[in-house]
Amino acid sequence: MLKKNNKRKIFCSALVLGSFGFLAASFVSIIYVITKNKIQYQEQRYKNIIFNHIVPSNLHDNDIQRSCLILNNKLLGDKKNHYLWLAKKKQDITAVIFETIAPDGYSGIIKMVISLDIKNGKILGVRVLSHNETPGLGDKIDVNISNWITKFSGVKIFSLDERDLSLKKYGGNIDQFTGATITPLAVVNSIKRTIVLVKMLLSSKFSELTSCDNYE
């Protein structure tokens, strides 16, 4: 009889613990979904703000974030998949936005987006999405800190050996930062690699790339 009572107590305890575990797991899952959706919403909102700064409204009439493609090319800084977005006017592609990284920043990876006018081949804008560069030195790549990154707007790049689009220290026209050369050099080189890739893609079809919807 005593053994039966002990078994019953063990069973009840296990049942209670299992129920609490299930409820806890369910609660965590619900919080995860809510948090994930909120994060995704904030990311989309942030990208909309960025896109509005680097692609003029008169160049597109589509929802740029919905015209998303996946591209994998080492010129984008690594071997991972990157996003690119197409700006369209009356279904014609007018500009393209590339997600790219500078893997060789002073304090690690610098994540950026670069937009290019398809018609004239000029850079429309560049913005840094995230970085870990030194405050007061390398963080001048952030448009909220200085206007340095805006000086690439209107620039046209023809090759990776573009002399003018180099730091003044190396005979170019781009200002380096006082006490910080590695950061701006990493950004400049990343921009050149990305634009060269864009020009390569213009000779092919963007439709051959995978849609973000299909990828996800």
Curated annotation (Swiss-Prot):
It is a single-pass membrane protein. Part of a membrane-bound complex that couples electron transfer with translocation of ions across the membrane. GO terms for biological process: electron transport chain. PANTHER family: ION-TRANSLOCATING OXIDOREDUCTASE COMPLEX SUBUNIT G. Its cofactor is FMN. Keywords: Cell inner membrane, Cell membrane, Electron transport, Flavoprotein, FMN, Membrane, Phosphoprotein, Translocase, Transmembrane, Transmembrane helix, Transport. The modification FMN phosphoryl threonine is found at T181. GO terms for cellular component: plasma membrane. HAMAP family: RsxG_RnfG. The keyword rRNA-binding does not apply. The chain crosses the membrane at residues 14-34. The lineage of its organism: Bacteria, Pseudomonadati, Pseudomonadota, Gammaproteobacteria, Enterobacterales. It is found in: Cell inner membrane. NCBIfam families: PRK01908.1, rnfG. This is Ion-translocating oxidoreductase complex subunit G. Belongs to the RnfG family.
